[in-house]
């Protein structure tokens, strides 16, 4: 009899609640930054997302964008609900604020010439672990009248070697306080034609050029969209 009562008691026990995954320090930091942006920051730096505006949370991605200001990290940070590691020049850590930000965001710091094996290996490690990386292939902020500065190699190769899709983010004007900025996000794409083969210098150069042409295509597309919006307001 006691065994029957014990069995019935076991049967009516409520299901155990799943323990919530404990957030890492980096995940907590990015969650805090996004809350700050969506509660107040977007009033100061309003961004209109165009193109593929869904959240890119399903896997790791290589985010690639043109570089006009220090605010360029925002479009990548709000494109997903997970952390993203920014590749940046080591010089940003030369002052206290830059060093603090780089440490908090776990940025991947590069030598000025862009050739840094340790940094590349670290970026590959993050991507293989399901984390995303953001790269500005111009290597520095564009303060000229040219659409893009000459690209430094690396973004396409990183995507190919880790078989990680690329998402392009382009802007036509430098983001400013209290001015709406338009950011175009591409759909994810891959350079599958280079997978599972030994890359030559010609392959790398060709992949870099394809990436640049795609960015130019989306740049002109965004420029035309903005122009049409202005014409409709007249």
Predicted regions and their residues:
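Non-catalytic C-terminal accessory region of glycerolipid acyltransferases
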Residues: 2-25, 29, 120-234
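Helix-to-loop junction immediately C-terminal to a conserved catalytic motif
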Residues: 30, 34-67
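Short, glycine/polar-rich helix-capping loops at beta-to-alpha or helix-loop-helix junctions
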Residues: 33, 93-98, 176-178
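Short, basic, glycine/proline-bearing loop/turn elements
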Residues: 37, 104-110, 139-143
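Structural motif corresponding to alpha-helix initiation and N-cap regions
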Residues: 49, 95, 117-120
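Catalytic core of membrane glycerolipid acyltransferases/transacylases, capturing the structured
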Residues: 55-114
């Amino acid at each position: 009899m006691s065994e029957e009562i014990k069995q019935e008691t076991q049967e009516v026990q409520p299901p155990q609640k799943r323990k919530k995954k404990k957030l890492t320090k980096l995940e907590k930091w990015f969650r805090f930054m996004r809350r700050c942006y969506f509660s107040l920051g977007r009033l100061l730096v309003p961004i209109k997302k165009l193109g593929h505006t869904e959240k890119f949370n399903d896997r790791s991605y290589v985010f690639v964008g043109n570089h006009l200001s220090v605010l360029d990290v925002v479009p990548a940070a709000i494109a997903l609900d997970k952390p993203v590691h920014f590749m940046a020049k080591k010089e940003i850590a030369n002052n206290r604020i830059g060093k603090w930000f780089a440490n908090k965001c776990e940025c991947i710091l590069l030598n000025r010439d862009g050739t840094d094996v340790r940094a590349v290996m670290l970026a590959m490690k993050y991507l293989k672990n399901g984390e995303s990386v953001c790269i500005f292939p111009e290597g520095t902020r564009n303060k000229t009248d040219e659409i893009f500065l000459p690209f430094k190699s690396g973004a396409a190769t990183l995507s190919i070697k880790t078989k990680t899709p690329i998402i392009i983010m382009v802007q036509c004007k430098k983001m400013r306080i209290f001015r709406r900025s338009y950011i175009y996000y591409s759909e994810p794409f891959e350079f599958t034609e280079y997978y599972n083969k030994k890359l030559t210098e010609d392959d790398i150069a060709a992949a870099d050029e394809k990436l640049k042409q795609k960015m130019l295509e989306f740049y002109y597309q965004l420029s035309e969209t903005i122009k049409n919006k202005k014409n409709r307001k007249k």
